[in-house]
């Protein structure tokens, strides 16, 4: 039986993109051929790769880059020939380390209304990931820190190099991780682990991130003498220490750390296994009903979306006002400090606030790293 004419293929499509050009400095958008599980190409079908391309600043996103991600996610979502989205960073050092602290310190610090407008864009970037009609895979090629962790957790899947590190940075550098971390982490890992990650800002390994439940898979990325080896800086051979505490994924210490650093120096980074695992995941998604997959994504995103939509506008307002006080000082310290000294004098700040000193006046300068060095 022939299909009725009204169901025949359309030869001309409506264009649902807001703009025709997705290009913005620092963000690459490309469509790569989709492949079946056997490696053969699926003609006419693609995976959209969105790459944060600012490797000299660890793929931290500038204002223009935030715009670029929004446009790229929207384009990939609308593209009829796109199977899924791969969101990654350039190079092998970082997926993303969050907002560009140079831009924060030199333009947004002290300008709450400007930062409020910036945060509208940031919120739209996170929302564009959560609203994408295609599965979004975070290809974690290196550090996923601060805002980088937040946009990474907005994705549906995360496949990581085992050399990558994870964590938040807010309270250490003048902000609060309310661009997604305080929404997504409690959903994924529970209140206690979320509290420790967001308040203490201690980085953790990819193996620990996998164990916590915020990664789909972890693959080795270090080659030594031609063979892939697990990250030699973290414990991967035992689950517990002698006291029954978790040891897997924790940083090595003492002689074990020295040996691990020596192995790192002998090896080289190779992301081919990461790429193979990402392609494998894309191929598995290819062999699903597209509309059923989209509906499944929409349902599974609801816990994250409920928290995100409830809090994002309050977060935007608070972050803008915070640019007058702690954010101004924290981002300035990070931008102007040395590699090993990018934090304010936290104890001095607390002492001065306890004594009643106002942020209006010399407090900002007194707590900077350069003030500590001059003392």
Q: Can you describe what each PLM-predicted range is?
A:
Residues 41-53, 67-110, 127-140, 157, ...:
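A structural preference for short, pocket-lining loop segments at secondary-structure junctions
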Residues 58-61:
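Short amphipathic alpha-helices within nucleic acid-binding modules
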Residues 65-69, 118-121, 274:
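Hydrophobic alpha-helical membrane-association signature
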Residues 121-125, 181-184, 193, 295, ...:
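Hydrophobic alpha-helical segments typical of transmembrane helices
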Residues 128-147, 151-290:
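Crotonase-fold acyl-CoA enzyme core
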């Amino acid at each position: 039986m022939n299909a009725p004419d009204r169901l025949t293929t359309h030869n001309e499509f409506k264009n649902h993109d807001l703009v025709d050009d997705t290009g913005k400095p620092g963000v690459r958008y490309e469509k790569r051929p989709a492949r079946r599980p056997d490696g053969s190409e699926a003609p006419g079908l693609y995976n959209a790769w969105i790459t944060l391309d600012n490797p000299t600043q660890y793929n931290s996103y500038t204002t223009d880059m935030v715009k670029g991600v929004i446009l790229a996610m929207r384009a990939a979502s609308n593209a009829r020939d796109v199977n899924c989205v791969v969101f990654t960073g350039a190079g092998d050092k970082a997926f993303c380390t969050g907002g560009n602290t140079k831009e924060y310190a030199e333009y947004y610090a002290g300008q709450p209304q400007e930062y409020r407008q910036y945060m509208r864009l940031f919120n739209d970037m996170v929302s564009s990931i959560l609203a994408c009609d295609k599965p979004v895979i975070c290809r974690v090629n290196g550090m996923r820190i601060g805002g980088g962790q937040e946009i990474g957790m907005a994705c549906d899947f995360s496949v990581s190099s085992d050399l990558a590190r994870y964590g938040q940075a807010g309270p250490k550098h003048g902000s609060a991780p309310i661009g997604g971390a305080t929404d997504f982490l409690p959903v994924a890992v529970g209140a206690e682990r979320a509290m420790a990650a967001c308040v203490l800002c201690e980085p953790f390994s990819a193996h620990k991130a996998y164990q916590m439940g915020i990664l789909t898979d972890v693959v080795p990325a270090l080659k030594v003498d031609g063979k892939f080896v697990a990250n030699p800086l973290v414990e991967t051979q035992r689950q517990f220490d002698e006291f029954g505490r978790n040891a897997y994924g924790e940083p090595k210490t003492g002689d074990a750390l020295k040996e691990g650093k020596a192995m790192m120096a002998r090896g080289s980074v190779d992301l081919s296994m990461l790429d193979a695992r990402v392609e494998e995941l894309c191929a598995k998604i290819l062999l699903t009903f597209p509309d059923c997959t989209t509906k499944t994504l929409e349902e599974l995103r609801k816990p994250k979306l409920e928290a995100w939509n409830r809090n994002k506008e309050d977060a935007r307002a608070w972050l803008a006002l915070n640019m007058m006080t702690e954010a101004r000082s924290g981002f300035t310290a990070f931008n102007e400090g040395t590699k090993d000294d990018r934090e304010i004098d936290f104890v001095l700040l607390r002492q001065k606030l306890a004594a009643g000193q106002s942020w209006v006046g010399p407090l900002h300068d007194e707590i900077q790293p350069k003030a500590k060095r001059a003392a």
